[in-house]
């Protein structure tokens, strides 16, 4: 009897339909602006590892709810289905599954940073503490 699909199998299948960005390419796009960057990791993970500067935290478990225009808890920043969205997480797996879900929901321009935050760091870019200090004070950017 075959067991269900593994996490890796699901990520691989989702990745066939998802655009992957090398960290250098993602950095260029982010520097230009006009991009929504979302870290889909859990808040405790972001506190532990940090996140890419400018990232919003919307967890994998909340993303589809926040992106659904018919949900009460929808996020106004996710209403434009044509906007450029870049997703990340610790290693890229959860972000890939999340990107696949957003594409199924009708978002047209969704991509994932290859290797997630680890790939970002390996490319020589820094992560910022979460929550990011604002004027020397910690302020949560979580969208809960």
Segments (PLM) and residue ranges:
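Rhodanese-like catalytic fold shared by cysteine-dependent sulfurtransferases
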Residues: 1-35, 40-84, 93-144
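Short, surface-exposed ligand- or partner-binding patches at beta-edge/loop junctions that are enriched
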Residues: 88
């Amino acid at each position: 009897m075959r067991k269900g699909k593994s996490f890796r199998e699901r990520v691989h299948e989702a990745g066939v339909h998802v655009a992957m960005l090398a960290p250098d390419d993602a950095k260029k796009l982010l520097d230009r602006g006009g991009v929504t960057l979302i870290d889909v990791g859990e808040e405790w993970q972001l506190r532990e590892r940090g996140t890419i500067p400018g990232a919003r935290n919307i967890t994998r478990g909340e993303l589809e709810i926040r992106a659904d225009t018919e949900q009460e808890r929808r996020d106004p920043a996710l209403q434009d289905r044509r906007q450029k969205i870049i997703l990340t997480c610790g290693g890229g797996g959860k972000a890939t599954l999340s990107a696949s879900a957003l594409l199924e929901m009708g978002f047209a321009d969704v991509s994932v940073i290859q290797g997630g935050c680890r790939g970002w760091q390996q490319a020589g870019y820094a992560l910022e503490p979460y929550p990011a200090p604002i004027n020397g004070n910690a302020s949560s950017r979580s969208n809960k």
